[in-house]
């Protein structure tokens, strides 16, 4: 049984497509381009004189379990940052 030129071309193109898809896919958690997330929000609990880091931690944790929060006393804002690097 001979392999036709059309069948061989189809097979090669399928393999190339599969390989390029695997290289471009970022479905594995923890693999790929990691970016540091940092964003600050106005939160009443971070206003002076009452600075409540626990409230900021809860606020950021509600946005995503990958974030932690800390009140920035210089700007009076709650800053959420990523736990992973």
Swiss-Prot record:
Keyword Disulfide bond: yes
Principal subcellular localisation of the protein: secreted
Compartments, as annotated in UniProt: Secreted
GO biological process, one term: defense response to fungus
GO cellular component: extracellular region
Signal peptide positions on this chain: 1-24
UniProt keyword terms in alphabetical order: Antimicrobial, Disulfide bond, Fungicide, Plant defense, Secreted, Signal
Family: Belongs to the DEFL family.
Protein name: Defensin-like protein 112
Organism this protein belongs to: Arabidopsis thaliana
């Amino acid at each position: 049984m001979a392999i036709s030129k059309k069948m061989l071309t189809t097979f090669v193109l399928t393999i190339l497509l599969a390989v390029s898809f695997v290289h471009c896919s970022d479905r594995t958690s923890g693999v790929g381009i990691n970016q540091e997330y940092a964003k600050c929000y106005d939160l009443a609990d971070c206003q002076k004189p009452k600075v409540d880091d626990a409230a900021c931690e809860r606020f950021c944790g509600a946005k995503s379990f990958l974030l932690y929060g800390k009140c920035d006393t210089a700007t009076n804002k709650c800053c959420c940052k990523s736990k992973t690097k």
